[in-house]
Every structure is written in C-alpha cells, then in structure tokens.
Regions:
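Extended, small-residue-rich solenoid/repeat segments and analogous flexible loops
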Residues: 1-45
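Flexible, glycine/small-residue-enriched loop-and-beta-strand segment within the central core
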Residues: 37-48, 53-126
Length: 126
C-alpha cells in the first residue's frame, strides 16, 4: 500500500467549512438530492451519479488526490461519513444506512514509543 508521511513540524490545519456548490463537483448526475446539513470537502474530486440521495448531516470528505464515486440510484443515510483519501467507489443502487463510516486511510501502528498521530498514514481503495 502506498503511504504518506505528514510533516511532523506541521500543526493542525483547517479543511475548510464543507460548504459547497453543485457546480464544484467533478460530475453530478440528474435528480440528485442533497439534504440540508450535508458537508462536502474537495467536491472537485467527487462524482455523483443520477438519482443519488444524500441524507441530512452526511459528510463527504473528498481528498486532494483521491477520488470518490457514488453510482446511480444510491441512497446514503443521515450522518454518514465517507473519506476518500485512498479512493472510494460505491456502485449503483446501493443502500447505505444512517451513521455508516467508510474511511480509506489509517495511521499505521509503529510501536508504543511513537504516538499514533506521528505514525505514517496508509491508503487503500474501497
């Protein structure tokens, strides 16, 4: 798996507000419903098929180099969290219940002496 190491001298940084416009998506199909309270980060790397439903307060966390693709007719429940650092592809006509989290990266365990947030980050597609 490819890995990326964060500069240990960098501190916390904001990813932005999550506010978006439909025109910012890489591609968005017809009849897409995005309920109030949904946050979207890096919409330029997100493709939404036609007839997609995204429930209230879901978070689509695109990534500057990863891609997120959500297929036609897919239903995403309220308060879901999707992170696409390692690429995330959800097929057509998939139902995802409320509160589901799909994360495509993790901090590798490097021993008790190294804090987890200082360990390397690994990515994998889902």
């Amino acid at each position: 798996m490819p890995s990326e190491k964060k500069n240990s001298n960098s501190g916390p940084r904001s990813h932005g507000s999550g506010n978006f416009r439909r025109t910012q998506f890489k591609r968005i199909g017809k009849s897409v419903i995005i309920e109030p309270g949904v946050l979207v980060f890096h919409p330029e790397n997100i493709v939404l098929g036609s007839n997609v439903y995204i429930g209230h307060y879901a978070i689509l966390k695109g990534y500057h180099r990863g891609q997120m693709k959500i297929g036609d007719g897919t239903w995403i429940g309220q308060q879901c969290f999707f992170h696409s650092a390692g690429n995330l592809i959800i097929g057509k006509y998939v139902g995802i219940g409320p509160g589901v989290k799909i994360i495509t990266s993790f901090h590798a365990e490097e021993g008790i002496a190294k804090p987890i947030l200082k360990s390397r980050i690994e990515f994998a597609p889902v």
